[in-house]
Amino acid sequence: MTIQCSVCRNHVQSMYCAHCINTSPNLLHPLRMQLLMVQQKNKVLKGKVEDILSHALDKNWKSSDNDTEGIILADRLHKLEVLKRTKRNNRVRYRISQLTKRIENKQQRLQSLRLQITTTDVAKVSNANKKEIEEIRTKYLQLNEVVKREQELECQSLVDWFILRKRNSYEIPYTLVFLPVVSLKNFHKLPKAVTISSLHKMFQFLEIYSQIISFPLLYKGDEIKEKTINTDEEIAKLITKLVINVLQIGRFKNLIPKDAIDLVWLLDQYDVDSLFYNVIVNHKMECRVVLFHWTFGKVSKVVTETLQLPAGSTTSFPRQQVGDTYDKDDDMWHIVG
């Protein structure tokens, strides 16, 4: 049975029924043979293609046929790989160029902002802001002047309260609450109790004075409050602390150079009492400048050597008599008029 086109009447395909196929094997046998031959050709072609691909991909190729197809395919695949790499490199290069441009733009922006920061001054500020700044500056200067005047008045009140005086006397040129201000030259001439009392008042004065000028002291003189001063060496350490406090206040008030000073020359010219008085009354002092870093131990050594105290001394030097005073360490009535 054949299929016929109803338009052109052309026989396109034959069709057999199941009965004919089962009863006539010769009809199906040629078709089966053709199918087997096609399958065999497909296997051969498949093996050939695999060999060509194996050769093209640099695998072990052992085909006995002509390898022209493999060489051509390998060349094409190599070109394809080169094109892929080129495309990928171009994409990366383009991305790098874009990032480079962004970085350059950001650098230019950064430079422009820095230039604006460095070139911005009061002239670029608006008139309202300039007026506000001037008002704040004026108020600050006024408050600063008020604070300075109040500090000066309080300092003068403190001087009057402690009765800090300068006397026309060589041995005792300065007094504080009617007690002689301790110096290196009158140290051995005053009773020990008077020396300790004088140092106690001087530390009290400096503590209140530092609070007025808002300057913290390095040393407070707590040894006097605890009454643990027994030897001249301990008194010398107390004088060292006093000298350091006075020097720090003098530097804070710009009365003494802030560079490394010649402390030996300064104490020789002014001594402790004159140094104390000049700093309190705001007298500027000239001083030699040296390349030397002063520490507590070095200042203590200068004070000890000036007082001519032996190192590690545990005893007190005998006191000399000054005026009508008595040579007693427990004399608390060494009052100067």
UniProtKB/Swiss-Prot annotation:
Residues 5-20 are annotated as: Cysteine repeats. It is a peripheral membrane protein. Its main location: membrane. It is found in: Preautophagosomal structure membrane; Vacuole membrane. One of its GO terms (cellular component) is phosphatidylinositol 3-kinase complex, class III, type I. Keywords: Autophagy, Coiled coil, Membrane, Protein transport, Transport, Vacuole. GO terms for biological process: cellular response to potassium ion starvation; cytoplasm to vacuole targeting by the Cvt pathway; pexophagy; piecemeal microautophagy of the nucleus. Residues 87-153 form a coiled coil. Coiled-Coils at the N-terminal half are essential for autophagy. Required for cytoplasm to vacuole transport (Cvt) and autophagy as a part of the autophagy-specific VPS34 PI3-kinase complex I. This complex is essential to recruit the ATG8-phosphatidylinositol conjugate and the ATG12-ATG5 conjugate to the pre-autophagosomal structure. ATG14 mediates the specific binding of the VPS34 PI3-kinase complex I to the preautophagosomal structure (PAS). Belongs to the ATG14 family. This is Autophagy-related protein 14. It comes from Vanderwaltozyma polyspora (strain ATCC 22028 / DSM 70294 / BCRC 21397 / CBS 2163 / NBRC 10782 / NRRL Y-8283 / UCD 57-17) (Kluyveromyces polysporus).
